[in-house]
Curated annotation (Swiss-Prot):
Keywords: Glycolysis, Oxidoreductase, Thiamine pyrophosphate
Protein known as: 2-oxoglutarate dehydrogenase E1 component
Top-level taxon in the UniProt lineage: Bacteria
Subunit structure: Homodimer. Part of the 2-oxoglutarate dehydrogenase (OGDH) complex composed of E1 (2-oxoglutarate dehydrogenase), E2 (dihydrolipoamide succinyltransferase) and E3 (dihydrolipoamide dehydrogenase); the complex contains multiple copies of the three enzymatic components (E1, E2 and E3).
Biological process according to GO: glycolytic process; tricarboxylic acid cycle
HAMAP family: SucA_OdhA (MF_01169)
InterPro entries, sorted: 2-oxogl_dehyd_N, 2oxoglutarate_DH_E1, 2oxoglutarate_DH_E1_bac, DH_E1, KGD_C_sf, ODO-1/KGD_C, THDP-binding, Transketolase-like_Pyr-bd
Amino acid sequence: MKIEKLMALYGENGALLEELYNQYKLNPETLDKEWKSFFQEVDTNGLANGSGYTNGNGKSAVATSFTDAQAASIREMGIINLLNAYRRQGHLAAKLDPLGIQKPNRTFIDSKLHNISPADIDTVVDSETLGRVKLAEIVDLYEKVYCNTIGAEHFYLVNDEEREWLQKKMESPEFLAPLPRGIKLRLFEKLFQADYFETFLAKKYVGKKRFSLEGGESFIPLLDTIVEEAGYHQMDGLVIGMAHRGRLNVLVNIIEKPASLIFAEFEEKTDKDNLSYADVKYHLGYSNSRMTTSGKEVKLSLAFNPSHLECVDPVVTGSVRARQTLIGDKDRSKYMPILIHGDAAFAGQGVVAETLNLMNLEGYTTGGTFHIVVNNQIGFTTLPDESRSTLYATDLAKGFQIPIIHVNGDDPEAVYRVVKLGMEYRQKFKKDFIIDLVCYRRLGHNETDEPAFTQPKMYAIIKNHPPTVKLYEKRLVEEGDIPQEDIDFIKNGSMHGLEDSFQRAKEQDVKIRVDTMQGVWSKFSKDSLDSEPATKLLAEQMHGIVQALTSVPQGFTPNSKLVKLLQSRKEMAEGKIPVDWGFAEALSFGSILESGFRIRLSGQDSQRGTFSHRHAVLVDTNTNEKYIPLNHISSKQAKAEIINSSLSEFSVLGFEYGYSLSDPNALVMWEAQFGDFANSAQVIFDQFISSSEVKWQRLSGLIMLLPHGYEGQGPEHSSARLERFLQLCALDNMQVCNLTTAAQYFHLLRRQMLRNYRKPLVIVTPKSLLRFPASLSPVEDILQGAFREILIDDSGSKPDKIEKVVFSAGKVYYDLMKYKDENKIKNVALVRVEQIYPFPAKEIQSSLKTFKNAKQFVWCQEEPKNQGAWFFVRERIEELLPGNARLVYAGRHESPSPAAGHMKLHLQEQDQLVLDAFQA
């Protein structure tokens, strides 16, 4: 019998039971089988017919006629329900809020709710952890575990092993055992360091923004415990992503960045060689190695990040994935990401869910991220009931089957316990784990803000609430095993250390210096963009690559159409037919792998390719087995990962960017399904990819493939918003290309890896050109050619006969060429700008000297006038034109929408812009 129906036997539910029993006597078939079976048992046990009698207490005669065994069974179920209520809903009764504003709710663990009488509390039961004991002892244990300063949410986990493991750990005597004296002293030391650091900054730099951690100081011992546990678990490194609040504290007290450097940043003592070091101090990252008490050195990296909350999340996880790959960490136990969230941001920012969704995906898993929500119960001036629709800020994570432990920030020992639990869980199950550190914000959003304007009651409470370090000091002294002298020794050491660092920053030549070109980056340059390595492919090298790319293992059955594709690629390599874009890419990939560079390409449908042009991963039609020809070229090659991503742009691009930061020897590529959708990841483009070098001196060789081209598919499938990327271009920060031939694509990919520096590369890739005959390339262009930043086509015209030069980029060139050929125009030269940035001024100037008699100059583009490359190239090209010549525009009119939604209108516009180019 289901517990819900058995509960009906008690008290006020007797009337319902009576009604059901009468219904059973009249027509048993009208009841479900469980009730029918139950009443059959009742009749068998001798319950009298005519069940309307009640006993002296007013209870149903049915309810009073059960055997002792049945009553015992019901009592047992009540006990089970009560204990499971502690496990399931004990967090609601926990004392989590240091301020006492959020009151515990004990409704669900009320013994009366589960029909447990005072006498039942003395029932002897079997316990896995306590043995055969009275129920009262188990309830007492559960009160301490689930309803004190720790609130556990784990009962929703569908994996029985995970759920039971967590319960067993938390309910074991070891979980609540008194902490060793050394651990208590360390917790106090880190708490005091956190508290005093903020106090010190407040005194020395009055009114300066530092985004204080005050009210959440337990965050520092929490992080310190993670580092110590990482050493215990023999981890090699941790990568941390966090926003600005408490960041300076973390840099000094966790990463162990010299405090003198922090003070130098307040003093703005920037090294003259680092004038481009252009970001505020609470956005900066740092890396260091820390020796843990277990004797294991752990590398710590705090990621640089902007003020855009949570956008660093996928960047950190991507960086960790790369580090795991570099050291061969296949079980993902050596490197771990740590993400620090705010309560409002965790619930409010969509990238959090996007990043959580990557947790178990084969191409993105890191073996579990350790999440800490620094829950100060406010977002700037916004309270929780204004910023989320859930009880907890962390409720989102339940859908991803992630355990969540809430803990009161005023209990550092509870914080320590849940960190140890979380680290063990992560290492065992290779899954994310979340600690919700419930604390408060003692000051306003920043040090100049007045929080009492908007939260007067909360800040009246905060004003009178002692700091956590004071509470813990009092607790330690009262417990008696740590004398005041030991506590004072810790205090004095921390205070003197900060004062010494401050004086050094004031009096000595402490300069802010940044050197991100270390480790795997040490062989790369930050300066030269003139490097043009040979990118041609030797014939003998190509032979082995082609053999691998066009073969499948014995017994593997690809789709019949793909058999034809593989055969056609053989013919391309033999020179019988031109090389298409898909095969040009495959050849470049193969040659890059043979050179020892890893390849990682991810995006929506990237294994096949949105336009069915790639087919880098073949699928057996009989078994669904996958085969990647790129990984079977030679025994010495590097590995290729071709990944179908989740349906996300923001998190996946952020992940790949993070990956590229940690592995410059990998060709890392992100492909948008259509370039139009890239703006879903605009924060990553703006805050990281385009600006990380000038802000943080962080380099990246990430390639972004953004399908682009006007083909009548409407405003959402035509434009990668080329103009937006060009607007971001300055100081040689990245490369933007719009290619017109398969060979150009081949050489550009190889150039990206063979250069001795790394810059992001945006390629607005073709769609219809993928198979357009004129854009395909003879194999000789791959064997002998090189990437050319501009391509000139004068169709055999004599240079001195050229009167007009039409510049363009991308697919529109072929429309121009068609018109020129059809109309036998000989006095117009077409110049394709294949690399728009860095702008190829020298090459264009050289071409103009060739056409010395040209008087008219046109820029032709498919995009509307306010979009595309027009506003970017106009001044740059005009500066190169002879005399007072001006550059004339030919293209679509200005429009807020990228493209027309009807094919007829599209064709009219396309014909007109081509006509304008020749008649302008």
